[in-house]
C-alpha cells in the first residue's frame, strides 16, 4: 500500500495521511514510516476522530483545516465494511480545496451501503455480512482475523 501511495503522489512535496482513530491512525503511522524509507516526500500525519455511534456529530482533527488546502490527502482506515465511517471521513474534507483525495484501507469487506471506495487496499475479503473482521496492531505482530 505504501508503494502505491508513493507512486500516486510521486510528484508531491508533501502529503497528508489522515488516519481514522484508532486503528486507521495506527495504520497511517505504519504507512508513514514506510513512506519515509522509500521517498523524500514530507508526510504530515493527522488523526481523524469520528463518533461511530453518531457519525453526524462533528468530525475532529488534530491539525488545522487550513493545512488541508491544496494538499494531497489520503484518508486511512483499517476496515471498509459498510462504508459509514469512511463516507463521514470523506465528508469532513469536502469543504476544503484539495489537490487530490484518496482512501486507503487494510481490509475491504465489499459490503458497502454508501458509494465509497478504497483507492489503496491491502486485501479484499468477500464474507457473509454477519462476520466481523478484527484488526489487531502490536509492536511484534499485527493480525487480521475473521470472527
Per-segment meaning from a language model:
Residues 1-147:
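PRPP-associated nucleotide enzymes
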Amino acid at each position: 500500500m505504501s508503494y502505491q501511495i508513493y507512486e500516486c503522489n510521486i510528484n508531491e512535496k508533501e502529503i497528508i495521511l489522515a488516519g481514522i482513530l484508532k486503528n486507521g491512525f495506527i495504520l497511517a503511522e505504519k504507512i508513514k514510516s514506510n513512506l519515509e524509507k522509500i521517498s523524500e516526500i514530507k508526510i504530515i500525519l493527522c488523526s481523524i476522530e469520528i463518533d461511530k455511534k453518531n457519525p453526524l456529530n462533528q468530525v475532529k482533527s488534530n491539525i488545522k483545516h487550513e493545512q488541508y488546502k491544496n494538499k494531497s490527502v489520503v484518508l486511512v482506515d483499517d476496515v471498509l465494511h459498510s462504508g459509514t465511517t469512511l463516507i463521514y471521513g470523506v465528508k469532513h474534507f469536502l469543504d476544503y480545496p484539495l489537490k487530490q483525495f484518496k482512501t486507503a484501507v487494510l481490509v475491504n469487506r465489499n459490503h458497502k451501503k454508501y458509494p465509497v471506495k478504497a483507492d489503496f487496499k491491502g486485501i479484499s475479503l468477500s464474507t457473509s455480512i454477519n462476520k466481523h473482521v478484527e484488526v489487531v496492531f502490536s509492536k511484534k505482530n499485527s493480525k487480521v482475523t475473521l470472527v
